[in-house]
UniProtKB/Swiss-Prot annotation:
Pfam families from the UniProt entry: Terpene_synth, Terpene_synth_C
Membership in a protein family: Belongs to the terpene synthase family.
Top-rank taxon: Eukaryota
Record GO terms (molecular function): magnesium ion binding; terpene synthase activity
Any single GO BP term: diterpenoid biosynthetic process
Record-listed Mg(2+) 2 binding positions: 307, 311
Keyword annotations of the record: Lyase, Magnesium, Metal-binding
Cofactor(s) demanded: Mg(2+)
Task of the protein: Probable sesquiterpene synthase.
UniProt-listed Enzyme Commission number(s): 4.2.3.-
Name of the protein this chain belongs to: Probable terpene synthase 8
Additional detail: Does not produce any detectable product when tested in vitro.
Motif (DDXXD motif): 307-311
Length: 551
């Protein structure tokens, strides 16, 4: 059987070549070297201002509206991680006193009420949506006088997307505010107009944290009421973290370059820069998560290469061999594979060897978990290959069951936990139990990916996606399938919100990973498949890694 695969490779086999665009970055990030003096300078300046910003935060606790405003500023500017314990304590106090506070302050404006609602919900505290009832008239419509309150409308719009099932007032608010903001945007100052348009394109709750922070710093800089100390602190910290990210990007770029898979497996996508953006968005921006970011980036690029092998190059016979070899997960199985697959197989085993060598004592079970998730991935990828080979169109739910694995969601979670020192078997068991936020983050990613990529995949020849499966099962045109999948996506996001606001037996860091997974899926696939057509991410890459802020 192995001999057949090798002989086939020497023949002119008809392969499903995708002809993916080449990397737009090459090895440009691999040569970066972090200068200790530069990072030390930024760190010193950040530490000098940190105490003053903390004083500002603590002083704001005298009044709830001022307190929530400062907390929101710290979050939007991307510096709240410096004060996590203080912010958590303050939010607990605000949440506990909120009913009486709102009852005693019926005059509160829409902006403030919506801000309290959003910030508390985004930090896992479920404020009831009836706080917005007072902004409706006797006919159940939103009052006309709020249509001229641009700041309040924007605040309500941002709050409306943190909704759960059964909250009709928030569903109505989303439509109402979006309609009015699209008209009002042209009537405000240019810098506020851009802020509104950014929000309409991507509400903060849906966005990539670091990119949202960069956009907000530019907006805040034009705010006449800005605090210069806070602005400078945010800029310095952004530049400091940017240097750290560039160093991490250089590390994974050199790792990928040394594997030399781009030359040996020219059919596959070289997207090491883009997958690091993914890792940064999913894992989080804090410096202490560097190991997880590096591992998620490495596993994402490796999984992408495996995916391209199954979807866009390998014959069904070769794919069966590769899947069988991976069940053994041993170098002894390498000789059963065609030559090109040997390079990939060896690279994966080497990655696992690295993680085992770097693992803390007594945590080898994390690497075992990652290996098992990789085996699951190859089985699921092969299943799609078998479907394609036999011209079988699975039922919609049958497809989604298998596709929940091919999203690579749990494999990348394993990589995240590998790098998270405090993670233990408790976190792995929680993920394997598949709580609602885990299931729906993967579902959200799969469906967005399919809608963005299915037409081009079908042209070159690929397994039916959720779109084709839905069309086939229900006998509907593509447009109707899109419409129904869009409804599923909306439901999925509400499920994510709902579960996010529940108490879980794992840390908030782990729960955050899954809401970030959904956010990054939205970031990559909302307009087009930005992994494949990476020019769509070029501006964002430059903003995040190449353009420091003037201080």
């Amino acid at each position: 059987m192995a001999a057949e695969a090798k002989n086939d490779e020497q023949q002119d086999i008809a392969r499903r070549l995708a002809k993916f665009p080449s990397t737009i970055w090459g090895c440009s990030f691999a040569s970066f070297s972090l200068k200790d003096s530069e990072i030390e300078s930024y760190t010193q300046q950040v530490e000098e201002l940190k105490g003053k910003v903390k004083d500002m935060l603590m002083q704001s606790t005298k009044e709830i509206t001022q307190n929530i405003e400062v907390i929101n500023l710290l979050c939007r500017l991307g510096v709240s991680y410096h004060f996590e314990s203080e912010i958590e304590q303050q939010l607990n106090l605000i949440f506990a006193s909120l009913p009486s506070f709102l009852n005693d302050n019926g005059h509160l404006d829409l902006y403030t009420v919506a801000l309290l609602f959003r910030v508390l919900r985004q930090h896992g505290r479920k404020v009831p949506c009836d706080v917005f009832n007072k902004y409706k008239d006797d006919n159940g419509e939103f009052k006309k006088d709020i249509t001229s309150d641009v700041k309040g409308l924007l605040s309500l719009y941002e709050a409306s997307v943190v909704s759960v099932h059964g909250e009709e007032i928030l569903d109505e608010a989303l439509v109402f505010t979006k309609q009015h903001l699209e008209t009002l945007a042209a009537q405000v100052s240019p810098h506020f107009e851009q802020h509104i348009r950014n929000a309409l394109l991507c509400p903060v709750h849906y966005g990539m944290e670091r990119l949202q922070a960069r956009l907000y710093i530019s907006f805040y800089e034009e705010d006449e009421s800005r605090n210069e100390i806070l602005l400078k602190f945010a800029k310095l910290d952004f530049n400091r973290l940017q240097l750290l990210y560039r160093e991490e990007l250089a590390i994974v770029s050199r790792w990928w370059k040394d594997l030399d898979l781009t030359e040996r497996l020219s059919y596959a996508r070289d997207r090491i820069v883009e997958v690091y953006v993914w890792a940064l968005g999913c894992v989080g921006s804090q410096p202490q998560f560097a190991s997880s970011r590096l591992l998620v980036a490495k596993f994402t690029q490796t999984a992408m290469t495996v995916d391209d092998t199954y979807d866009a190059y390998g014959t069904i016979g070769e794919l069966r061999l590769f899947t069988a070899a991976f069940e053994r997960c041993s170098i002894d199985a390498i000789h059963e594979l065609p030559e090109y697959m040997q390079y990939l197989y060896k690279a994966i085993l080497k990655l696992f060897e690295e993680t085992e060598n770097d693992a803390n004592e007594g945590s080898s079970y994390k690497t075992s978990y990652a290996k098992e998730m990789f085996k699951e991935l190859t089985r699921a990828d092969l299943q799609e290959g078998e479907w394609f080979n036999s011209l079988y169109v699975p039922a919609f739910d049958e497809y989604l069951h298998n596709a929940s694995i091919t999203t690579t969601g749990e494999l990348l979670t394993a990589a995240f936990l590998l790098g998270l020192k405090e993670a233990s078997m408790k976190e792995i068991v929680w993920v394997r139990d598949a709580p609602k936020i885990v299931r729906n983050a993967k579902l959200f990613a799969r469906l967005l990916d399919d809608v963005a990529t299915h037409e081009e995949e079908q042209k070159r020849g690929d397994c039916p996606s959720s779109v084709e499966c839905y069309m086939n099962e229900y006998g509907v045109p593509k447009e109707k399938a899109y419409e129904e999948i869009k409804k599923i996506l909306a439901t999925s996001w509400k499920d994510i919100n709902e579960d996010y606001m529940k108490q879980h037996r794992v840390s908030r860091t782990v729960v955050n990973y899954f809401i970030n997974f959904a956010r990054m899926s939205n970031f990559v696939y909302k307009v087009r498949d930005a992994y494949t057509y990476s020019t769509h991410l070029k501006t964002y890459v430059a903003t995040l890694f190449l353009q420091p802020l003037p201080v």
